């Protein structure tokens, strides 16, 4: 496998499950300190009742927060295809966002022949519970 590609223009063709790690394109428009660029996210909620192909995600980053607060959760054991393997991941629960499936895709590898191999990722149940707790802390502060 030669090149590494992280996101395509095709929307996610299924309803993602909480704990699933996807790639989100925040490229379109950002104001002020809003999230930008393509980055991994963890799905924290995706209700059938939305019926608008929306889900709520928490962005992941290899940049450690300064200072580390109660709403940041370290994920040192997590490695997402295409991201720096040596840098530990952080869940930035203060950057919670509801996004369209159009912004989401699974990470994938691209072969020399042009094919794609999607690489599914999911958090451990304990990490998802910790991230949800961090969201609660942030929202009630």
Stretches found by the model and what they are:
Residues 1-6:
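Short, structured beta-strand/loop micro-motifs enriched in basic residues and often containing a Trp
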Residues 28, 61, 95-97:
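A broadly conserved detector of short glycine/acidic/proline-rich loop/turn motifs that flank catalytic sites
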Residues 30-38, 43-81:
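Compact nucleic-acid interaction/catalytic patches
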Residues 78-141:
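C-terminal terminal-subdomain/extension
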């Amino acid at each position: 496998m030669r090149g590494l590609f992280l996101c395509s223009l095709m929307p996610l063709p299924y309803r993602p499950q909480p704990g699933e790690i996807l790639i989100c394109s925040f490229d379109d428009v950002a104001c002020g300190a809003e999230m930008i660029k393509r980055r991994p996210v963890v799905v924290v909620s995706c209700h059938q009742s939305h019926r608008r192909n929306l889900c709520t995600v928490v962005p992941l980053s290899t940049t450690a927060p300064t200072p580390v607060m109660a709403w940041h959760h370290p994920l040192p054991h997590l490695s997402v295809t295409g991201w720096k393997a040596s840098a530990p991941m952080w869940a930035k629960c203060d950057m919670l966002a509801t996004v369209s499936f159009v912004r989401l895709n699974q990470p994938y590898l691209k072969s020399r022949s042009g094919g794609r191999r999607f690489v599914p990722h999911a958090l451990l149940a304990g990490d998802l519970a910790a991230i949800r707790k961090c969201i609660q802390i942030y929202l009630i502060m």
